[in-house]
């Protein structure tokens, strides 16, 4: 079989049909859609059963006890038959030609991974475009597993880390350490719903500190493949830029203060001389300003700048 698409499902009855419609309508041939119900308490299973009955052999339904996104994806990978593996979140949807175009790009360029652009759709109608061609280093592209297609032989026995946030960063980055054969497609084939109640919007949760666990683990893998220099970028991008900013955007509280302090101390340990870091100096001026402010405990100024820029759009 050419392609396996893995779809973890939990509390998405409102969006699931749109997701599955976009998958069963793919123009690629010889593929399967593995739909893993991760113990969802809503009516998602009824929708899965309906699609499995309408598309026998194409939809592969699975049910498991709730264990989180990583465990659902890992189960899907364990049974996948495809030469290539793709992941789609069950509240998102994709262009009908996405996987056909990705497979063509991989085969044309003899690549192990293909990327495409993404669009995020927010509840207020805002649409944010993510252009993967804006970055020269693959590690700088969005860490989402969902706008990518992976060669199964590259994945090997790699899995998503159970029980942690930033599972995509862990999984994708480890694969990027193993190959530089990447095909890039400048089309927004992947469209995501950004819901107010989604996991990563929990700005005050201590799970934000999972980023430290993930980066420490990635550092071990980086050493195996001679990619130690990439760890600095991960700290810059995922702690000094996005991590601290996400927590700082929440309401003031003791928990928020402690989360930011822990992240900042970790960044300072990894980057004791920030402005001398080649990774830092290679960033754009805008990103360097925000990173510098957050490094020095001035995240309130960062928030003012970011909010002012957002209002001007």
Language-model features, listed with the residues they occupy:
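Membrane-interface aromatic/basic loop that binds lipid-linked glycans or pyrophosphate carriers
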Residues: 253-313
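Residue-level recognition of alpha-helix termini/interfacial anchor residues
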Residues: 51, 55, 227-231, 295-298
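Catalytic core of nucleotide-sugar-dependent glycosyltransferases
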Residues: 189-195, 202-229, 242, 249, ...
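Amphipathic alpha-helical repeat scaffolds of TPR domains
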Residues: 233-246
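Nucleotide-sugar donor-binding/catalytic module of glycosyltransferases
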Residues: 1-217
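Structural motif
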Residues: 224-235, 280-288
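Residue-level detector of alpha-helical secondary structure
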Residues: 52, 103, 219, 264, ...
């Amino acid at each position: 079989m050419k392609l396996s698409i893995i779809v973890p499902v939990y509390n998405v009855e409102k969006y699931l049909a749109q997701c599955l419609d976009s998958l069963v309508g793919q123009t690629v041939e010889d593929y399967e859609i593995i739909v893993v119900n991760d113990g969802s308490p809503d009516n998602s299973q009824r929708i899965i059963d309906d699609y499995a009955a309408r598309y026998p052999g194409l939809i592969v339904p699975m049910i498991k006890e709730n264990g989180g996104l990583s465990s659902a994806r890992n189960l899907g990978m364990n049974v996948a038959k495809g030469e290539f593996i793709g992941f789609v979140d069950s509240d998102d949807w994709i262009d009908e030609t996405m996987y056909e175009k990705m497979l063509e790009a991989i085969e044309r360029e003899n690549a192990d991974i293909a990327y495409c652009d993404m669009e995020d759709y927010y509840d207020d109608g805002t649409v944010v475009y993510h252009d993967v061609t804006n970055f020269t280093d693959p590690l700088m592209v969005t860490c989402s597993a969902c706008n990518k297609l992976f060669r199964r032989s590259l994945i090997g026995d790699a899995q998503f880390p159970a029980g942690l946030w930033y599972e995509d960063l862990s999984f994708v980055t480890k694969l990027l350490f193993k190959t530089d054969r990447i095909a890039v497609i400048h089309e927004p084939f992947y469209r995501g719903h950004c819901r107010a109640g989604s996991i990563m919007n929990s700005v005050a949760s201590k799970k934000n500190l999972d980023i430290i666990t993930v980066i420490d683990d990635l550092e071990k893998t980086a050493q195996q493949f001679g990619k130690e220099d990439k760890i600095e970028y991960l700290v810059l991008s995922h702690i000094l830029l996005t991590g601290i900013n996400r927590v700082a955007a929440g309401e003031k509280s003791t928990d928020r203060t402690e989360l930011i302090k822990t992240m900042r101390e970790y960044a300072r340990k990894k980057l004791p001389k920030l402005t001398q870091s080649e990774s830092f100096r290679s960033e754009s001026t805008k990103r360097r300003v925000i990173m510098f402010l957050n490094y020095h405990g001035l995240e309130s100024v960062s928030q003012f700048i970011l909010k002012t820029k957002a209002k001007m759009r």
